[in-house]
Amino acid sequence: GGGIKGNKITEICIIVLQEGKEINRFASLVNPGREIPLYIEKLTGINDRMVEDAPYFDELASQIDALTQDCIFVAHNVGFDYNVVRAEFKEAGLDFNRKRLCTVRLAKKLIPGLFSYSLGNLCTSINIPHYDRHRATGDTEATVILFQRCLDLDPEYEVIQGFLNRKSKESYFPPHFKASDFEALPHKAGVYFFKDKN
């Protein structure tokens, strides 16, 4: 807990899609090798007793690496999840590099105008079943349905390709930041005041 640095995985779920359909799945509790902070236990329901006999991440790393070869890493707020997984791989002495796609960004582009784009609120807004919130399998299953809905809204993959294109400015913006807002910024030096919602 407490930011990306120092986070450890206590549970992982991977669902592999091909042409929008599930072709493989892996889920496991993970022993983080340290005490689970109380706020994480309250959020997820996962406690030290539940993970004491679970495998450590380095015991799962090769299997996860093989399962995700040639895959795009898709997650809701992908920057966080990807960096935590990548840090676990690094700690296990392995490299982990995948293309990434964020369902927060996709949803904001393809389903504009919602009050909130948190996974729970988004699922409520567009009628996606979301069981076992804050557990790996429940959140992953909900994210898969959200991603499938985004695929339906982007049949030519134009939006998805834009986000996957590393040269696109938009792929670097925070999820809440619009490219049009960036383009509208003045090009002259000076002092600027930002008010209300940054």
Predicted regions and their residues:
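Hydrophobic transmembrane alpha-helix bundles
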Residues: 64-67, 92, 112-119, 136-145, ...
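Extended, hydrophobic interaction surfaces within ordered domains
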Residues: 47, 102, 106-167
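GIY-YIG nuclease catalytic motif and its immediate N-terminal context
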Residues: 143-198
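Conserved non-catalytic scaffold segment of RNase H-like nuclease domains
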Residues: 1-98, 112-134
